[in-house]
Structure formats: C-alpha cells, structure tokens
C-alpha cells in the first residue's frame, strides 16, 4: 500500500470542514488515491507531474491535487484540496 502524506494546507482544509458527509467523501477520495493513484487524472502544462481527483458534493466540485514520488514504497503527497473555483490559480501560487 502506498504511503499518503498530507501537506499542512491540506490538513488545515480538512480540519475546517464541519460537514461530516463532505469530510467522509474527501477521506474516501484520499483512500482511493492511496490504493491506486492512477484513479485521478494526470495534469499537463504548468502542472505536469501532478494528478488530481474530482469529488462532487452538494452541487460543488472539489479537487484533490497530489504528487507521486516513487521511492521504495511509493509516496503520495497531497498538495492541496479545495473547491474547483480558482483552484488551479491558487495551486500555482501555492507551489
């Protein structure tokens, strides 16, 4: 099984979620990524090397952006989670 590492921004985002069902959907998405990181889509252009997984909840699209570092056991670093609106602009600023 792959090792999942959450960035501090990701940890803060998850901690701030008060809706239990949304938190469960995001945790389920993280479990899917841990089991098989190819479940997301590979990014191109400025974000080459990153992957993202869409989570739909209550008519809102959330993105989980992550990077895979191949080591002895693959390590998946979740860089950022947020709503789709302005997500990639904020991600590029974060990086």
Residue spans for each PLM region:
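Positions in alpha-helical segments
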Residues: 8-12, 48-51, 76
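A generic structural signal for secondary-structure junctions
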Residues: 18, 38, 92-93
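Active-site micro-motifs of SAM-dependent methyltransferase domains
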Residues: 12, 32, 86
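Arg/Lys-rich, positively charged N-terminal/basic patches that mediate binding to nucleic acids
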Residues: 1-29
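Conserved catalytic core of Hanks-type protein kinase domains
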Residues: 16, 32-33, 81
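A short, surface-exposed loop/turn module that caps and links secondary-structure elements
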Residues: 31-58
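Enriched for short, Lys/Arg-rich terminal
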Residues: 3, 57-95
């Amino acid at each position: 099984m792959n090792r999942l590492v959450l960035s501090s921004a990701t940890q803060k985002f998850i901690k701030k979620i008060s809706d239990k069902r949304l938190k469960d959907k995001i945790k389920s998405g993280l479990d899917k990524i841990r089991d098989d990181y190819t479940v997301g889509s590979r990014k191109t252009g400025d974000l080459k090397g990153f992957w993202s997984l869409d989570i739909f909840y209550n008519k809102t699209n959330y993105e989980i952006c992550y990077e895979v570092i191949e080591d002895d056991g693959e390590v998946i670093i979740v860089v950022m989670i947020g709503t789709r609106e302005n997500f990639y602009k904020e991600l590029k600023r974060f990086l």
